[in-house]
């Protein structure tokens, strides 16, 4: 009887310790990104960014105040959401640069493609109330590679191509946040 109790106790302690280990590991592989409206500089919520086991990254938005429908959703090369000037016009979020493309492919492709920008994410879907809460999975990314980069939300959808318009035809940048180093 004592042996059975001892075995149960050891099992319970092992389970508890392994659960603590999992929680700590999960926290180390997760970061929350505050997203700001680029016109008003006000917060629209957060996106939790976490490593999905050893394969890809999951982006879980908790956003409000967006236009309903599909939005282009990308990782941009610089961790800076400030505006820049281009051809005499203000570009909101312009300091974030272009799509994250460490292999210099120069091509906008599907998020699962290995021949396009690594910063090409699946479209972000916003419900009829202006809220985005559906997770987005990016199979070609590693969290450690995107620390210090920007997450960008564009006004329109994304056709995952450079045709008929470059960069998926997503439209102007509407919201941005920086993934902490």
Task: State the predicted function of each range.
Residues 2, 7-181:
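N-terminal leader/targeting pre-sequences
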């Amino acid at each position: 009887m004592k042996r059975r109790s001892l075995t149960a106790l050891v099992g319970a302690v092992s389970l508890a310790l392994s659960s603590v280990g999992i929680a700590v590991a999960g926290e180390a592989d997760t970061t929350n990104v505050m997203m700001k409206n680029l016109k008003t500089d006000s917060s629209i919520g957060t996106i939790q960014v976490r490593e999905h086991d050893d394969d890809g990254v999951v982006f879980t938005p908790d956003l409000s105040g967006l236009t309903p429908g599909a939005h282009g959703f990308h990782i941009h090369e610089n961790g800076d959401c400030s505006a820049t000037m281009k051809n005499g016009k203000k570009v909101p979020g312009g300091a974030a640069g272009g799509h994250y493309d460490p292999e210099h492919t120069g091509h906008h492709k599907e998020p699962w493609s290995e021949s396009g920008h690594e910063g090409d994410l699946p479209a972000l879907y916003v419900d009829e109330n202006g809220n985005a809460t559906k997770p987005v999975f990016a199979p070609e990314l590693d969290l450690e590679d995107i620390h210090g980069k920007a997450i960008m939300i564009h006004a329109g959808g994304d056709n995952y191509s450079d045709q008929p318009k470059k960069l998926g035809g997503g439209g102007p940048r509407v919201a941005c946040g920086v993934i902490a180093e």
